[in-house]
Regions:
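Membrane-embedded alpha-helical segments in integral membrane proteins
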Residues: 19-22, 37-55, 72-73, 106-113, ...
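C-terminal ends of transmembrane helices
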Residues: 22, 71-92, 131-146, 193-205, ...
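Structural signature of hydrophobic alpha-helical transmembrane segments
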Residues: 56-67, 117-129, 174-190, 232-244
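Membrane-interface helix-loop-helix junctions at boundaries between adjacent transmembrane segments
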Residues: 86-181
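C-terminal transmembrane helix-loop-helix hairpin of multi-pass membrane proteins
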Residues: 20-42, 220-329, 334
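Internal active-site segments that recognize and position negatively charged phosphoryl groups
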Residues: 164-218
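N-terminal signal-anchor module of multipass membrane proteins
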Residues: 2-84, 88-89
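Alpha-helical transmembrane segments in multi-pass membrane proteins
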Residues: 40, 63-76, 103-111, 123, ...
Length: 334
C-alpha cells in the first residue's frame, strides 16, 4: 500500500496514512568502548616505540594491523556466504562500519605488542591470523546468539607460544620501561592503571571482574606462600609490573568474551586467579595467557552444555505433553 504525505499543516485525508517519522538508529554501547580502547592502545604503541624502548621493529605494528584487517575481511566474507547474510562491513552506518574493524585493529596491535620473535616477523603474523580467525570458528550459543567465547588476542598468543616456542616468546617485561628513568618508571603503571580503570568502570562495566581477579591473585599468592613456601614479595610483586597492569585492564576485560552480570563477572576474575595459582604450582610458564585460555574455554563449554540441556528438556517436554482430546463432531488433525 502506498503512503501519501500531506502538505505541512494539512491533516491527512481519510484513507491516507501519514508518513512515519524516521526512527534514529540506536547507538551500540560497544562502539565507544572499542573506539577508546583502540585509541588508547594505539597511543601506547606510539609512546612505546618512541619513549619506552620497545624492541620490535617499527614496521611490525603496521604489518600486524594490516594482517588483522585482511584476515577479518576474508573470514567475514566466508561467514556471510555460509550463513546467507550480508557481510557486516557492508553498511551505510559509519559507526557499524568502524565497529567491524576496531576489534581487528586492537588484536593486531596487542599481538605485536606482547610477542617477541627477534627478527622473525611471521610468528607474530601467525598469532594475528589465529586470533582473528578463531572468532568465526570457536563459537557458542551465548544468551540466545552464536558468539565467540575465546579472548582473541590471548588465544592467538597462547597458540603461538605452544606451537612456535622455538622462534617466539612473550615480550620481555623490562621493555615497557626500558628507556624511562626512576620517576618516569613509577608514573607509567600509574597512568596505565588509571586510564584502564576509568575505561573499564565507565564503558565496559568490568569493575567486578577486575576486583575478583586482583583480589583472587593476592589470595593465591598468600596460599602459595603458606603451602609451598613461595616468597610472598615475589608472588605479590608481579602485580606492580606494567605487563600485569596491561593484562588486567586491557586483556582480561574483553567485553565480548567475559560475562555481563555482576556475580558472573566476579566469578570469572576469581576463577582466573585460581587457575593461575594452580598452573604456577606446576611451574608452567606463560601462566597468565594459558590461565585465561582455560577459563574462557570452560565458559564456552559451559554455554554449550547449557544449550544441550535446554534442548533435551524441550524434546522431553514435547514427547510427554498430552495430546488434545477429540471434540464430538470435530475431526482431530495430526
Amino acid at each position: 500500500m502506498a503512503t501519501t504525505v500531506s502538505p505541512a499543516g494539512v491533516a491527512p485525508a481519510e484513507g491516507q496514512t501519514a508518513a512515519a517519522a524516521p526512527v534514529p538508529l540506536k547507538k551500540d554501547p560497544r562502539y565507544q568502548a572499542l573506539r577508546n580502547f583502540a585509541l588508547s592502545i594505539s597511543v601506547f604503541n606510539i609512546f612505546g616505540y618512541t619513549l619506552l624502548g620497545w624492541e620490535q621493529p617499527y614496521i611490525w605494528p603496521f604489518f600486524a594491523v594490516l594482517t588483522a584487517y585482511a584476515t577479518e575481511f576474508v573470514f567475514e566474507l566466508l561467514s556471510a556466504w555460509a550463513q546467507h547474510r550480508q557481510p557486516a562491513f557492508r553498511t551505510k552506518d559509519p559507526r557499524a562500519f568502524m565497529l567491524f574493524w576496531l576489534p581487528a585493529h586492537i588484536t593486531g596491535l596487542a599481538c605485536n605488542m606482547l610477542l617477541y620473535a627477534n627478527n622473525q616477523w611471521w610468528p607474530v603474523m601467525f598469532a594475528v591470523i589465529i586470533a582473528v580467525s578463531q572468532k568465526h570458528v570457536l563459537r557458542a550459543p551465548i544468551a540466545g546468539r552464536m558468539r565467540h567465547f575465546m579472548n582473541p588476542s590471548n588465544f592467538g598468543i597462547s597458540v603461538t607460544l605452544l606451537t612456535l616456542g622455538t622462534w617466539v616468546s612473550i615480550s620481555p617485561p623490562y621493555q615497557f620501561t626500558e628507556w624511562a628513568n626512576s620517576y618516569f618508571k613509577l608514573m607509567i603503571p600509574m597512568v596505565i592503571l588509571t586510564a584502564g580503570t576509568v575505561l573499564n568502570a565507565m564503558l565496559t562495566k568490568k569493575t567486578a571482574l577486575i576486583v575478583g581477579w586482583m583480589g583472587g591473585f593476592a589470595i593465591q599468592a598468600f596460599v602459595r606462600h603458606w603451602i609451598f613456601g613461595v616468597q610472598l614479595n615475589t608472588a605479590l610483586g608481579v602485580m606492580t609490573g606494567v605487563a600485569f597492569v596491561l593484562f588486567s585492564n586491557y586483556m582480561v576485560t574483553d567485553p565480548a568474551t567475559t560475562p555481563t552480570k555482576f556475580l558472573p563477572k566476579f566469578m570469572f576474575g576469581s576463577s582466573l586467579a585460581a587457575v593461575y595459582g594452580i598452573l604456577m604450582a606446576f611451574n608452567i610458564v606463560y601462566t597468565l595467557f594459558f590461565a585465561l585460555c582455560i577459563v574462557c574455554a570452560c565458559r564456552g563449554l559451559g554455554w554449550w552444555a547449557a544449550h544441550f540441556i535446554a534442548k533435551r528438556r524441550e524434546s522431553r517436554a514435547a514427547v510427554t505433553s498430552p495430546q488434545p482430546s477429540a471434540i464430538p463432531g470435530q475431526a482431530v488433525t495430526t
